[in-house]
């Protein structure tokens, strides 16, 4: 005798349903649930449970699913219905009529990849949560180091006092009435109050929208900064304040990528923001490879070859991206390299996008901006050919990096030079749709580009804090570099700038084969093993792009101290010994 019990859009047909009791072990329950949740058909056995009815396609496309060797038996051997908790876990009692499914959402979003916050980052946060709950006694480490992302203050970089004091008044202007108390008790200097009053006069309140392009006074401060840096004038009308440089990249890419055939030249290895954004916009990433053997320098012939190859495929290449100093490579471009890229952009009518968010993170040589490079070329055009007059350049900067490290405040800017006024109007419209960048972030941009100067009350502390952060970063970068030099199968370029090292790693054949069996790329497998053994999260080179046949990983050197460097070296030796 059989009975049928409706459950939503499906029904369970149970053989000889009775009541009371069940002799399944926890292991059997787990196996049963796993079979259903994985949507795998099984071989029918006697006295089994059979799923039938119109809801069957939710589990599998076959007419029915048969669960092997799992009868529900009571004391008398009769078959019993499923317990309620299994029914509730596997099926909803309401019809499954969701409008959005993984198959009908924007597939360009689904295809986009952002390795910096991928599987490894998720797993590291699970470990961190476990340790915070006091449940990590089974782990071989007692702390998690997030060396996967340039997030300075997460790794204990202290905020610059002047910046935060100004921000505190911006958030609560009533503090201006307590100037004497703040000065005496918390060390607020006179110039802190002066700056806060100036900014409040411009933005009125950080809780109010600003102009879409950003507060006028702050854009003027940015223009003044660019002029001091480069020796050439800058127009605040050409400057847009943004929610970090990433927001500026998103705006520019949305304007540039007009059709699915649009292409953008991107350096490889690159920050995955670019490939992910192009993927979402259904446009083409046109990779050009940096020269690792020459300190990750830009090879202009390589860029030209990549451009021509893409054009032969029918790709309409409209822009070239340069990251200077590099991410993940840390390389800083020389002035001549910048001139070469600008010359190519002018010849091929490409928009040049200069990602310069690490411009203060330069350890070797000095930073050369693309804006200065363009103005130098225009001034040295002795034949007055006008070759560079129509070149479009967008330069980006951010409060997230450098010695500022205010990632969470989401502030940045981009300057646009040489753009058609009608295009600029469309960019203005695009940013207006998002209303404006966070106003507190705009204020942080202002103090970044206009910090305390010699002779001002806050300057001594500002200078002390700034130099300490810079020197600490440089010291840790060199400690990590020296450790990599001693590690078997690892080679690394000396740290030139930014917040990262991007070493090459050569793994034993047995390790490569084991990675393949695990369904992982070799560098990803190495990084996962490192995380499991040490709690240190780094990013596989594949997430940034790398030449075929090479393996890399990216690590920041933001974490304080050098103890964690020892964790890496010990793990690496054990890993290499394991797979000899």
Regions flagged by a language model, labelled:
Residues 2-5, 71-213, 217-580:
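PLP-dependent class I/II
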Residues 1-98:
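N-terminal mitochondrial targeting presequence
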